[in-house]
A protein has these predicted regions:
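Cell-envelope and extracellular/periplasmic
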Residues: 1-424
């Protein structure tokens, strides 16, 4: 990642004498680059070699030869090699993100690849990544595929994406066996897949979408499980730069507000974590928990591409990339009937789908009724029917399905939050 170069390693031995050189050839449509080394001493000769592959949207053919005079004998050949970055997706069914309504196949590319799938973690053969059918080799999910395609097209970097998700599982299911990290469980299967491919040092980011199955537990269970995972990920993937947490959506898990609040606050506790909202994805299927591709997984993938583009590839830090997130809340008139939510992204233009969105807010500690909502740059204002200054906090639960809500100029929904204190 620092040099924009990758490496393809060849290992082998040559038992026969009489050969003068080992030649490594890297070929593209633009030309051939060769390196030669003499074979000195007596056999067996080590044929270990490293081919340097630039990070670009170009497929390379790498061949190894031994020479006898002017005659070459090919001893190894690999086609369609690329060098790029490694991303991991993990969590439950919305991390798996298989097809529920509408195909993502138009986003497939020879420069997005994977090995195995969530249903075939033992696979070790490279394949073009796909997003629709979870049993297909190379399956990475619909929103990860859309995210990857946007990143590839925008930043011209090939990507290897690995999905280790499993539907319907609580956070305990995803934990590492600390005595045997590569045990035959979910964590160990993903780690083994990456370790066998020599990629554990190459993982740049992990994208986590899980929590629906923890809704019946105390949020502390979810938090403790996530903190343990974060520590283990940094141990097993030592060059990990970012962890992206998707805040779960109410619907199949009712509100799960305490878990959603904990997820909102993870970036406040750990500088390597970013959080993404799901509150303004109209493709949400409500009580069914999942998303159509259009206005659902497709949109989530595009939003993540913008976030990773900024964090990993130097794209501009636009104010609309992060989901709106309250920095402070205060009463802003003398009668206690106007409450203003100031956003952390002060430059983002806020939007509201309709006045119906006011019902997604609730005051804590006051019987005042929210009668109106308006928006501005970096702010949302709520109008109350009476003096609400006895309120101590404000909750935003959003809603499931295609219900109008609060979002920024690019449609990124405001994060759900619970009992955020009101400044007096």
């Amino acid at each position: 990642r620092e040099t924009n170069l990758g490496s393809a390693r060849f290992e082998g031995t040559l038992a026969s004498a009489g050969y003068g050189h080992r030649v490594l050839s890297v070929e593209t449509d633009a030309g051939i680059t060769e390196t030669a080394e003499p074979l000195c001493g007596e056999p067996p000769f080590a044929l270990d070699a490293v081919a340097t592959i630039p990070v670009e949207l170009v497929e390379h053919r790498v061949r190894a030869f031994v020479e006898v005079g002017s005659t070459r004998v090919q001893v190894a050949s690999v086609e369609d090699l690329v060098a790029g970055d490694v991303l991991v997706v993990q969590g439950q069914s919305n991390a798996v993100a298989q097809m529920y309504d509408g195909s993502a196949s138009a986003n497939e590319s020879e420069f997005i690849r994977s090995v195995g799938s969530p249903e075939n973690p033992g696979g070790r053969t490279w394949a073009k990544a796909v997003g629709d059918t979870v049993t297909d080799d190379g399956f990475i999910g619909q929103w990860p595929l859309r995210m990857a395609r946007t990143l590839v097209d925008t930043h011209r970097v090939p990507l290897a994406v690995f999905n280790g998700g499993k539907s319907g599982q609580p956070i305990a299911y995803f934990q590492r066996d600390d005595t045997t990290p590569t045990a035959n469980n979910n964590y160990g299967q993903l780690l083994s897949r990456l370790r066998d491919l020599g990629l554990t040092d190459s993982v740049r980011a992990i994208l986590w979408y899980q929590g629906e199955s923890d809704a019946s537990d105390n949020a502390l269970v979810h938090v403790a499980g996530f903190v343990a995972l974060r520590d283990d990920w940094h141990s097993d993937y030592p060059n990990l730069e970012r962890i992206y947490v998707t805040q779960i959506r109410n619907g199949c898990v009712l509100f799960a507000l305490e878990i959603r609040e904990a997820q909102r606050r993870f970036p406040d506790l750990y500088e390597d974590i970013r959080v993404m909202s799901t509150t303004n994805l109209p493709g949400h299927q409500g009580a069914f928990c999942h998303y159509a591709f259009k206005n659902g997984y497709e949109t989530l993938g595009q939003r993540y591409a913008a976030m990773l583009g900024r964090d990993l590839y130097g794209a501009p830090a636009e104010p609309w990339i992060d989901p709106p997130n309250p920095a402070s809340i205060e009463f802003t008139n003398g009668t206690g009937t106007e409450l203003t939510i100031h956003m952390r992204s002060t430059g983002a233009e806020m939007r509201v789908g309709s006045q119906e969105a006011k019902s997604q807010f609730a005051l804590v500690g006051s019987a005042a009724v929210i009668t109106g909502i308006s928006v501005g740059k970096g702010a949302v204002r709520l109008t109350l029917d009476r003096d609400g200054r006895s309120a101590t906090g404000l909750t935003f639960a959003s809603a499931d399905g295609a219900v109008p809500t609060v979002y920024n100029e690019r449609g990124v929904g405001m994060l759900a939050f619970v009992d955020v204190p009101i400044t007096k």
